[in-house]
């Protein structure tokens, strides 16, 4: 016969276990019910400041920069990459990073800017509107903003949950953006879809003086996959879209974070073994077979600089680095140069990349 005192202890334990099951079950139900994909072929709002058209046979510069929601200072290691941190250090730190990013971009004065991982309203960045702040700093540009992360509240890590995020990609152009469109990409089918971004690319149609269009694509392809299969499917969709635009006579430039090893073997180039980082697979060159498109991987053979660090802890000289940020161009775009800015990962786990080019007349 079980003593009365023991029965009470067992009862309390069972109540605690039941409460825990109900809490966890309720949270899982909340995440699954709240989950949704953002509508495909969604027209984007254009912040219109200019009616100027881009010119042919004129050199322009485009910069792509994944700013890591303004959290990835050199001391930051992200929990999903093997680090411990889930939020920016503070709101003040977020503002300082955005200010630094804006100052850098203003000093370079590119004609086009593609920015990934920009928070509008997120727990992880203390609800600071990074998109509005950057637009206010970067005057004289038309712009579009494309949402690719509208997540439920992620209650992990328990000590400081990542929280809820509303974020996306910002595209800026010194020339008139006629229209903008959001295209949804294939994503993971399993659990990862609940914590990964709602992958997409934006399509911004820029006026050109010869009555054609420069079709500008801003992208952030999938990471956290075991073999890069989904990212390849995403890339294939983008290539097909760009090829169709080229065949209409338009100019095409895509840029952003491909989450692929654009240098094929960054580990060898930068002297740090990347065998354990299977998400960073090279781009399959056969994807471009039969197309009028080519990959542009930012690289200086004499002084190679990586565009990304694996944020499994604070930045250090032994951390795995690679180049995942770059561009795709159509054959009627002549590229004169492309490289990585060596900012030492001061503002993000990415360094910005650039490409100079001309639209062929």
Listing of model-derived features with the role each one plays in the protein:
Residues 84-90, 118-120, 185-193, 220-229:
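Surface-exposed cleft-lining segments at the edges of enzyme active sites
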Residues 226-331:
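Metal-dependent phosphoesterases centered on the DNase I-like endonuclease/exonuclease/phosphatase
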Residues 61-67, 100-127, 172, 204-206, ...:
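Active-site beta-strand/loop signature of hydrolases that rely on acidic residues for catalysis
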Residues 150-214, 218:
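A well-ordered secondary-structure block
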């Amino acid at each position: 016969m079980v003593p009365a005192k023991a029965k009470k202890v067992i009862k309390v334990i069972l109540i605690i276990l039941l409460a825990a099951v109900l809490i966890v079950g309720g949270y899982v139900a909340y995440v699954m019910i709240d989950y949704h994909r953002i509508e495909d072929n969604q027209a984007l709002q254009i912040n219109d400041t200019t009616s100027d058209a881009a010119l042919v046979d004129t050199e322009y510069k485009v910069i792509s920069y994944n700013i890591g929601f303004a959290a990835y200072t050199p001391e930051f290691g992200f929990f999903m990459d093997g680090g411990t941190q889930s939020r920016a250090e503070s709101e003040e730190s977020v503002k300082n990073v955005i200010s630094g990013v804006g100052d850098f971009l203003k000093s370079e004065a590119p004609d086009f800017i593609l920015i990934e991982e920009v928070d509008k309203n997120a727990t992880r960045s203390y609800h600071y509107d990074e998109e509005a702040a950057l637009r206010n700093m970067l005057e004289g540009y038309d712009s579009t903003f494309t949402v690719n992360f509208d997540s439920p509240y992620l209650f992990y890590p328990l000590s400081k949950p990542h929280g809820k995020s509303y974020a996306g990609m910002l595209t800026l152009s010194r020339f008139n953006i006629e229209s903008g469109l959001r295209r949804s990409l294939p994503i993971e089918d399993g659990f990862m879809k609940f914590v990964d971004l709602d992958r997409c690319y934006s399509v911004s149609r820029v006026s050109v003086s010869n009555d054609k269009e420069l079709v500008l694509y801003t992208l952030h392809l999938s990471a956290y996959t075991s073999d890069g299969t989904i990212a390849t499917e995403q890339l294939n969709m983008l290539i097909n879209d760009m090829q169709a635009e080229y065949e209409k006579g338009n100019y095409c430039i895509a840029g952003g974070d491909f989450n692929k090893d654009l240098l094929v073997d960054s580990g060898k180039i930068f002297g740090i073994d990347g065998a354990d980082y299977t998400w960073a697979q090279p781009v399959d060159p056969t994807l471009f077979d039969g197309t009028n498109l080519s990959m542009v991987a930012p690289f200086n053979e004499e002084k190679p600089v990586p565009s990304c660090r694996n944020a499994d802890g604070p930045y250090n000289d032994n951390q795995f680095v690679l180049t995942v940020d770059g561009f795709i161009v159509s054959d009627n775009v002549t590229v004169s140069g492309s490289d990585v800015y060596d900012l030492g990962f001061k503002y993000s786990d990415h360094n910005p990349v650039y490409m100079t080019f001309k639209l062929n007349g």
